[in-house]
């Protein structure tokens, strides 16, 4: 298919994309942007040099007169030697264009331009196993059990093929950074971390790949094993993780694996002390349920403060925030703010899993998302991410962050009164939480020319079609990447007979012995 913009010649080191529609909040422009946004989903954004360069005159963008009601602005972007050389407000024609100083001129036709995406919470090691070991009930408990069953099929060869298939898919959709949680038990961990290291090196320069150890909180009862895990994570330059109050029964005495009763605070202290000793950042699964009793985020926040932890903390899911009273919600969010926690919402997966009837005959009554706008009001950084794709926890998905953004807008009503800062939730904010540097996730003069051009010209157009004809630019080069075909997975998925999974209705022993691994 012919691209809707003819790319510059591959040898061209200088070109200008005119008439690109860009969210003001992902541009490096004058500090006036702090007066124009409506919803803050990135803590201290107006103070960060990563987001707004103070008194920048080179950008020549006046947000008062150029941005529309959704914070979109029409700009010209000049790329030189793989970097963004200049960003300025679009004009019909300017002197630089007439005398050739802007290089080849390309017309974006007012199409939306975004920085490349950062997907901060995924599980690519489990990807594309949904048909092999099917979650018959579609529930969180059913996912746990069928995921355990699928373990018999794992080898380094098939794991490599599935994980790389996912990376190729994300890259073709315009993602430049992925953080994946990795199964880290004795058998699977012996495979996942070496394969992760191999792929991280292979994909260096295309996708920044980060790994998080995935363990339930009760695992940390074993001091020797938990210390060895921290040592393994450190050796692989990873992030330490734990699932806290993160099952259907999270926050209650019926969850011995992730809530852990009276031992919860002691175990959290152990997690933080290991992170301090081994100088590791932390990434938790927390409160993936609709239980008012589930207050894992509060306990993590208090543990961070109690242990004077200074590293980066990310907390994914946080669904039970929607079940809290107004008073408790305020207490939890204020604690998370003090602990400098970044919250990640996984709307697609939690729409599929949460509040599902195990018999399948009832419609869910609540949404599996935290209270995103209330979190933003407390000035807590928020990210949106893919989570699982085509596995036991979500039978669909393609690591397309535009789809994640689009559906999050619909699910959480992020578009009113204005989308404001929310584009940062899939670009700038996760890049900062992942420590990717000052220009990643931004369109910034002097930064890498890494961005995605869409044909849709406003959000209503962008979100109404798949944008399958999007154009990917990396380091100034136009990338001819396409999503891989599913038949590439046939050699590993067809060699195994489909696994017979758990019965639709679980018995009580199953319920008490489930172990959350999402």
What positions do the PLM features span?
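Di-metal (Zn2+ and/or Mg2+/Mn2+) metal-binding site signature of metallo-dependent hydrolases
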Residues: 111-132, 288-290
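Active-site metal-binding motif and surrounding structural segment of the metallo-beta-lactamase
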Residues: 93-115
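N-terminal metal-binding scaffold of metallo-dependent hydrolase/deaminase domains
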Residues: 1-99, 459
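His/Asp/Glu-enriched, well-ordered alpha-helical/loop segment
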Residues: 1, 281, 302-313, 366-454
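Acidic, glycine-enriched loop/beta-strand segments at the rims
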Residues: 24-35, 58-76, 365-366, 416-423, ...
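Alpha-helical scaffold segments that flank or form the walls of functional sites
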Residues: 112-113, 130-181, 187-202, 227-234
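C-terminal cap of metal-dependent C-N hydrolases
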Residues: 445-503, 513, 517
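Histidine/acidic residue-rich metal-binding segments in metalloenzymes
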Residues: 191-205, 221-314, 318-342, 359-384, ...
């Amino acid at each position: 298919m012919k691209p809707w913009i003819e790319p510059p010649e591959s040898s061209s080191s200088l070109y200008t994309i005119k008439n690109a529609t860009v969210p003001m909040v992902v541009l490096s422009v004058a500090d006036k942007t702090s007066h124009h946004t409506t919803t803050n989903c990135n803590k201290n954004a107006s103070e960060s040099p990563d987001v707004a360069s103070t008194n920048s005159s080179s950008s020549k963008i006046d947000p008062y007169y150029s941005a529309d009601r959704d914070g979109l602005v029409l700009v010209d972007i000049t790329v030189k030697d793989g970097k963004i050389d200049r960003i300025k407000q679009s004009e019909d024609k300017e002197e630089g264009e007439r005398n050739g100083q802007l290089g080849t001129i390309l017309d974006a036709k007012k199409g939306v331009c975004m920085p490349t995406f950062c997907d901060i919470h995924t599980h690519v090691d489990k990807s594309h196993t949904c048909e092999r070991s099917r979650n018959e009930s579609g529930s969180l408990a059913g996912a746990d059990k069928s995921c355990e069953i699928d373990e018999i099929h794992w080898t380094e060869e098939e794991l490599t093929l599935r994980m790389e298939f996912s990376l190729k898919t994300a890259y073709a959709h315009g993602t430049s950074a992925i953080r994946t949680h990795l199964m880290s038990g004795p058998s699977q961990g012996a495979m996942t971390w070496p394969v992760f290291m191999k792929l991280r090196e292979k994909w260096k320069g295309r996708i920044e790949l980060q790994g998080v150890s995935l363990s339930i909180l009760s695992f940390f009862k074993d001091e020797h094993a938990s210390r060895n895990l921290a040592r393994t994570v450190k050796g692989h330059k990873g992030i330490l993780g734990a699932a806290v109050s993160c099952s259907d029964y999270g926050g209650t005495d019926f969850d011995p694996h992730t809530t852990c009763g009276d031992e919860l605070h002691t175990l959290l202290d152990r997690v933080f002390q290991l992170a301090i000793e081994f100088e590791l950042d932390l990434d938790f699964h927390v409160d993936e349920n609709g239980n008012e009793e589930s207050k894992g985020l509060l306990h993590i926040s208090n543990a961070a403060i109690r242990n004077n932890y200074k590293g980066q903390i990310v907390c994914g899911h946080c669904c039970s925030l929607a079940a809290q009273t107004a008073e408790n919600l305020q207490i939890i969010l204020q604690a998370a703010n003090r602990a400098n926690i970044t919250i990640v919402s996984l709307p697609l997966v939690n729409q599929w899993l949460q509040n599902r009837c195990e018999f399948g005959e009832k419609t869910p009554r609540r949404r599996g998302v935290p209270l995103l706008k209330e979190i933003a009001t407390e000035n807590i950084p928020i990210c949106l991410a893919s989570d699982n794709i085509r596995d036991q926890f979500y039978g669909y998905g393609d690591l397309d962050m535009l789809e994640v953004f689009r559906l999050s807008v619909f699910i959480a009503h992020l578009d009113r009164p204005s989308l404001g800062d929310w584009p940062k939730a899939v670009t700038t904010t996760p890049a900062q939480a992942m420590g990717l540097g000052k220009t990643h996730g931004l369109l910034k003069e002097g930064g890498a020319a890494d961005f995605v051009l869409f044909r849709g010209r406003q959000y209503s157009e962008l979100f109404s079609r798949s944008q399958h004809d999007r154009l990917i630019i990396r380091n100034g080069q136009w990338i001819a990447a396409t999503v891989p075909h599913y038949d590439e997975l046939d050699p590993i998925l067809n060699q195994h007979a489909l696994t017979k999974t758990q019965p639709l209705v679980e018995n009580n022993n199953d319920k008490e012995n489930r172990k959350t691994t999402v």
